[in-house]
């Protein structure tokens, strides 16, 4: 099967320099969602018709399995499909999709393709409570589709029809090539309508059939930021429903955003306002507090992530305690029962089991052993202005508050660093190491007093 995706429109009502099909739904361009659905049908040829912002669209979706055709002038949907004809295989039917209709399911498209087979003309239709603005499906007395009439060209009787054309069609490619060559633009829009091919099919004796989606929202197109927001909420509602049906507890299903793939074990609880990006896996018994952002990460069984944490390309071990207000940056790997507390940032560091950094610390480019206590205000000074250097902290180390570890440096097993230490050399095992300026008291000192204003 050939699949053609129309993605040439300007999207004037978006009021944006970004091509319409690149506006995101769930953090990904609408066109990327349509391509994913198209690939699920295993097409032999996949063609994207580009126009406005063609270079940006090509760059955004470039892939070995995608060919591009360019519609230099936007003269209608029929004209757009004409541009793809040289890239299509006449021996297989062609399915036409739209880059700004991101929620259509593969199951719905498979039903349409099955209904049409190899020789019939298939149209995806849906009944709308308010069909204003959509092309109407006109049927004869026997119920057969005879044509599709656009809103601006419809009579009052035709405007009363509630069954509308979604724009998604499938038909024999050889016939499509012939029908497109006969299209005219003598209509209110001055465009070449793809929908006019239905009348050509009827005239040529090609049976026209229809299929319907499981839900109306599958066929919603996006032409404005308002419609984009509506589609986003529908998609997020679908994601929330999937999680609930899988046994996840969502404290408010209307306040979760999944911008990628979220998988969960048993007895997972997610509080309000959380955002999940990329691939995220939450193991059994995980609890995620309110307003966390988690991206491309794994959270181990029984771990608790308290409110307002950011976790990016990191691994949290089983029974971990994160936050509130903690930040785990890429390359962070935490072992079992590791505690990362409020206003602690960890980057490109491996922290072994039962270690803790509970307050106000930066642990970057470090290897931290087991049962280590990192005191409040501890900083690994990893950057010399050109290169990053590593800090190694071995098992059972105790680091006092307000300590700076100037990398590269190693703290040996069982060492204790006194509060306020600036460590520039190796700290030996099982000893107290500290560096501290001599404390002075100046007896004759007086605090300055502000002079009264003149």
Swiss-Prot record:
The active site is at 359 (proton acceptor). It catalyses: alpha-D-glucosamine 1-phosphate + acetyl-CoA = N-acetyl-alpha-D-glucosamine 1-phosphate + CoA + H(+); N-acetyl-alpha-D-glucosamine 1-phosphate + UTP + H(+) = UDP-N-acetyl-alpha-D-glucosamine + diphosphate. Residues 1-225 are annotated as: Pyrophosphorylase. It is an enzyme of class 2 (transferase). Pathway: Nucleotide-sugar biosynthesis; UDP-N-acetyl-alpha-D-glucosamine biosynthesis; N-acetyl-alpha-D-glucosamine 1-phosphate from alpha-D-glucosamine 6-phosphate (route II): step 2/2; Nucleotide-sugar biosynthesis; UDP-N-acetyl-alpha-D-glucosamine biosynthesis; UDP-N-acetyl-alpha-D-glucosamine from N-acetyl-alpha-D-glucosamine 1-phosphate: step 1/1; Bacterial outer membrane biogenesis; LPS lipid A biosynthesis. Its main location: cytoplasm. SUPFAM superfamilies: Nucleotide-diphospho-sugar transferases (SSF53448), Trimeric LpxA-like enzymes (SSF51161). UDP-N-acetyl-alpha-D-glucosamine binds at residues 6-9, 20, 71, 76-77, 98-100, 135, 150, 165, 223, 329, 347, 362, 373. GO terms for cellular component: cytoplasm; membrane. Residues 247-454 are annotated as: N-acetyltransferase. Its EC number is 2.7.7.23, 2.3.1.157. CDD domains: GT2_GlmU_N_bac (cd02540), LbH_GlmU_C (cd03353). Acetyl-CoA binds at residues 376, 382-383, 401, 419, 436. Binds 1 Mg(2+) ion per subunit. One of its GO terms (molecular function) is magnesium ion binding. Catalyzes the last two sequential reactions in the de novo biosynthetic pathway for UDP-N-acetylglucosamine (UDP-GlcNAc). The C-terminal domain catalyzes the transfer of acetyl group from acetyl coenzyme A to glucosamine-1-phosphate (GlcN-1-P) to produce N-acetylglucosamine-1-phosphate (GlcNAc-1-P), which is converted into UDP-GlcNAc by the transfer of uridine 5-monophosphate (from uridine 5-triphosphate), a reaction catalyzed by the N-terminal domain. Homotrimer. In the N-terminal section; belongs to the N-acetylglucosamine-1-phosphate uridyltransferase family. This is Bifunctional protein GlmU. It comes from Cupriavidus taiwanensis (strain DSM 17343 / BCRC 17206 / CCUG 44338 / CIP 107171 / LMG 19424 / R1) (Ralstonia taiwanensis (strain LMG 19424)).
């Amino acid at each position: 099967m050939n699949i053609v995706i129309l993605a040439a429109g300007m999207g004037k009502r978006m009021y944006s320099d970004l091509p319409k099909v690149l506006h995101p739904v769930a953090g990904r361009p609408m066109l990327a969602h349509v391509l994913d659905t198209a690939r699920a049908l295993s097409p032999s040829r996949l063609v994207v018709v580009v126009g406005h912002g063609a270079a940006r669209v090509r760059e955004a979706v470039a892939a070995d399995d995608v060919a591009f055709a360019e519609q230099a002038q936007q003269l209608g949907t029929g004209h757009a499909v004409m541009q793809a004809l040289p890239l299509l295989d006449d021996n297989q039917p062609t399915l036409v999709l739209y880059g700004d209709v991101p929620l259509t399911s593969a199951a719905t498209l498979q039903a349409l393709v099955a209904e049409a087979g190899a020789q019939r003309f298939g149209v995806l239709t849906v009944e709308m409570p308010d069909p204003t603005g959509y092309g109407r499906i006109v049927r004869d007395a026997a119920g057969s589709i005879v044509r599709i009439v656009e809103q601006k060209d419809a009579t009052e009787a035709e405007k009363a029809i509630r069954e509308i054309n979604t724009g998604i069609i499938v038909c024999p490619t050889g016939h499509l090539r012939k029908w497109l060559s006969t299209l005219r633009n003598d209509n209110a829009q001055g465009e070449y309508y793809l929908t006019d091919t239905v009348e050509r099919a009827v005239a040529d004796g090609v049976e026209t059939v229809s299929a319907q989606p499981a839900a109306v929202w599958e066929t919603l197109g996006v032409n404005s930021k308002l419609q984009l927001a509506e589609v986003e909420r529908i998609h997020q509602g679908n994601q929330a429903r999937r999680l609930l049906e899988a046994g996840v507890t969502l404290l408010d299903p209307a306040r979760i955003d999944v911008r990628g793939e979220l998988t969960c074990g048993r007895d997972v609880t997610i509080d309000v306002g959380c955002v999940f990006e990329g691939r995220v896996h939450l193991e059994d018994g995980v609890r995620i507090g309110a307003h966390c952002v988690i991206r491309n990460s794994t959270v181990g069984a029984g771990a608790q992530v308290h409110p307002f944490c950011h976790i990016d390309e990191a691994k949290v071990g089983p029974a971990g305690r994160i936050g509130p207000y903690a930040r785990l940056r890429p390359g962070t790997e935490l072992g079992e029962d590791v505690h990362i507390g409020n206003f602690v940032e960890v980057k490109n560091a491996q922290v072994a089991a039962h270690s803790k950094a509970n307050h106000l610390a930066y642990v970057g480019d470090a290897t931290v052993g087991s049962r280590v206590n990192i005191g409040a205000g501890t900083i690994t000074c990893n950057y010399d202005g050109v290169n990053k250097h590593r800090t190694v902290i071995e098992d059972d180390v105790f680091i006092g508050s307000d300590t700076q570890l100037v990398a590269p440096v190693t703290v040996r097993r069982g060492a204790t660093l006194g509060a306020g230490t600036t460590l520039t050399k190796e700290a030996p095992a099982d000893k107290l190491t500290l560096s501290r300026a001599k404390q002075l008291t100046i007896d004759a000192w007086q605090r300055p007093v502000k002079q009264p204003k003149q």
